[in-house]
From Swiss-Prot:
Name of the encoding gene: AXY9
UniProt key word Transmembrane helix: yes
Lumenal compartment residues: 54-368
UniProt entry keywords in alphabetical sequence: Glycoprotein, Golgi apparatus, Membrane, Transmembrane, Transmembrane helix
Gene Ontology MF annotations: acetyltransferase activity; xylan O-acetyltransferase activity
First-listed, main subcellular location of the protein, grouped into a coarse class: Golgi
Residues passing through the membrane, by range: 33-53
Name of the molecule in the record: Protein ALTERED XYLOGLUCAN 9
Subcellular location: Golgi apparatus membrane
Length: 368
């Protein structure tokens, strides 16, 4: 293509300047005729060169697509930028009269996205039940991991079904059966949600490989581990190694382009949206066993956090999964948002779900 352009330009120069020079020699006394001839030849050259150059509409489309792509990346990077407003309830006496109340009930927890120019340009929003129903209509959602993942699944179902609905009463009981999987189909919108108890990275790895073998892929996968490994293995280097293994399998979870299968046929390219549930801030003095206080110290926590970053499993580090920044949320919500220094108020996981949904809107090029 480049050689054709060079050849065309060379020919154009010959066609343009040789006749102009000849015309100038013979018509130097008639400047009007000279310039008319020059203009005619120039227009003819432009007509002949036009096929070798992209159209203006192509250039504009190319530039606009780059701008949209850059804006999308910028908004994904900003989606976790939320701030918290945690205040004591105005009437603590009413909380005291409630027999089932805990320390968490004495504080009102509100959150929203930061009001910086970058964040405002992304137009993030808290979605209601109807918005989420439209977004996840007909989707297969998988939430896999430890207890943090279970709380994320609960918050998502709260939003889809309505926290006050009768369906949520049974969901809470079934979802929190100790160390078990859970599955539900929301018939009204055709959404299926699977919670997979997978407290170790190897469990997540096996899950991802199973989807690859079956050639059946969820639309959304939300996963996260770390706490069990920290408590029961207590080796940050091994944690990082396991995450790198997981990352390599997640990257090949689905074909990016149609590929031929063995025995004929093709696998159509499709998009699986992948999210990682970050580890919460651990408040050591509030942990409920001596073993946890010893093995899950601040030093160990930071080693695990560093291994997570170095594993390159996260999108911000060049990996496949978008971070749901539970670390930031729990740090900013503070000790008023936890009873045991590890598991936090539902508001934290609600925020994570809204962050995930806004990222999903960006990734799937949708708007509400």
């Amino acid at each position: 293509m480049l050689g054709a352009i060079h050849l065309g330009v060379l020919a154009a120069c010959f066609v343009l300047f040789v006749p102009m020079a000849m015309a100038g020699w013979h018509l130097s006394r008639n400047k009007m005729l000279f310039f008319s001839g020059a203009l005619f030849i120039s227009l003819a050259v432009c007509v002949h060169l036009t096929p070798y150059f992209p159209s203006v509409s192509d250039i504009v489309a190319s530039v606009s697509s780059v701008v949209v792509y850059d804006h999308r990346i910028s908004c994904i990077n900003e989606v976790n930028q939320i701030v918290w407003d945690v205040k004591p309830v105005p009437n603590p006496e009413s909380v005291r009269r409630n027999n089932g109340s805990t320390k968490l009930d004495y504080f009102v927890k509100n959150w929203d996205w930061m009001k910086s120019r970058k964040v405002l340009s992304c137009e993030f929003q808290k979605l209601d039940k109807f918005d989420v129903s439209d977004l996840l209509n007909g989707s297969w959602v998988v939430v896999a991991g430890d207890s943090q993942a279970r709380f994320v699944a609960l918050s998502l179902l709260n939003l889809v079904l309505g926290s006050d609905s009768k369906a949520m009463d049974s969901v809470r009981g079934d979802l929190f059966r100790r160390h078990s999987d859970y599955s539900i189909v929301v018939k009204e919108i055709g959404m299926k949600l699977d919670f997979v108890w997978a407290p170790y990275e190897k469990d997540l790895d096996d899950l991802v490989v199973s989807y690859k073998k079956m050639k059946k892929y969820p639309d959304v996968v939300i996963m996260g581990t770390g706490l069990w490994h920290m408590l029961h293995v207590n080796n940050a280097s091994d944690f990082g190694f396991r995450l790198r293994q997981l990352s390599s399998h997640v990257e090949s979870l689905v074909p990016l382009t149609p590929k031929e299968q063995e025995g004929g046929g093709s696998v159509s390219g499709r998009s699986v949206h992948l999210f990682w549930i970050g580890m919460p801030v651990l408040i050591n003095g509030m942990l409920n066993t001596d073993e946890k206080k010893e093995k899950m110290s601040d030093t160990v926590w930071h080693e695990y956090d560093r291994s997570l970053g170095e594993s390159k499993i996260l999108r911000q580090m060049g990996g496949p999964l978008i971070l749901l920044d539970i670390q930031s949320f729990t740090w900013n919500c503070g000790p008023q948002c936890t009873l045991d220094g590890m598991h936090y108020d539902s508001a934290v996981y609600d925020a994570a779900v809204h962050v995930m949904l806004n990222a999903l809107l960006i990734e799937s090029h949708q708007s509400l």
